[in-house]
């Protein structure tokens, strides 16, 4: 039976490249000179923005988002947290990277597939949703229904098998 998987993944190499490009641009741009604005990454691939003011932190976030968009990373995978005051009158902002399909989102995808009335079955398998059907056309209709639902996370369709 034909099947495919619905997953939510982020290409970490592209995130790394965009992060490095944004860090270089912030270091070189005239409007960031002397503002102590910097980008850092942690073990979980989250980005920490440190800046001298809220405006510079927001501008650094915009630079990062611009570089990510140019590299093909979906901006829905970013989860910017609230600006926090830091020592020395600076501010910091953590930007988390959403990776993997949470159970609630997977359940919503399964419910959307079932309510669409297409003759396919959807099952949650870890951090993916496996959709199986008898015809390839049914699977393509299921993909269209999932895309039309406009979920707030980036979705990819993988392992399309006949």
Swiss-Prot record:
Pfam families: DUF520. One of its GO terms (molecular function) is nucleotide binding. The keyword Manganese does not apply. SUPFAM superfamilies: YajQ-like. It comes from the Bacteria. One of its GO terms (cellular component) is cytosol. Disulfide bonds: none annotated. InterPro entries: DUF520, UPF0234-like_C, UPF0234_N, YajQ-like_sf. HAMAP family: YajQ. Belongs to the YajQ family. This is Nucleotide-binding protein A2cp1_0112. It comes from Anaeromyxobacter dehalogenans (strain 2CP-1 / ATCC BAA-258).
């Amino acid at each position: 039976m034909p099947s495919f998987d619905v997953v939510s993944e982020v290409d970490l190499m592209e995130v790394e490249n965009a992060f490095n490009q944004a860090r270089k641009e912030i270091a070189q741009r005239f409007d960031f000179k002397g503002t102590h604005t910097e980008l850092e990454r942690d073990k979980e691939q989250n980005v920490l923005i440190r800046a001298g003011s809220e405006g510079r932190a927001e501008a650094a976030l915009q630079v990062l988002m611009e570089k990510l968009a140019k590299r093909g990373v979906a901006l829905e995978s970013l989860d910017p947290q609230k600006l926090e005051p830091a020592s020395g009158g600076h501010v910091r902002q953590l930007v988390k990277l959403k990776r993997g399909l949470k159970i609630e989102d997977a359940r919503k995808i399964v419910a959307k597939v079932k309510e669409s009335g297409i003759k396919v079955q959807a099952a949650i398998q870890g951090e993916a949703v496996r959709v199986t059907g008898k015809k390839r056309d049914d699977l393509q209709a299921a993909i269209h229904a999932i895309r039309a639902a406009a979920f707030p996370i980036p979705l990819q369709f993988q392992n399309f098998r006949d």
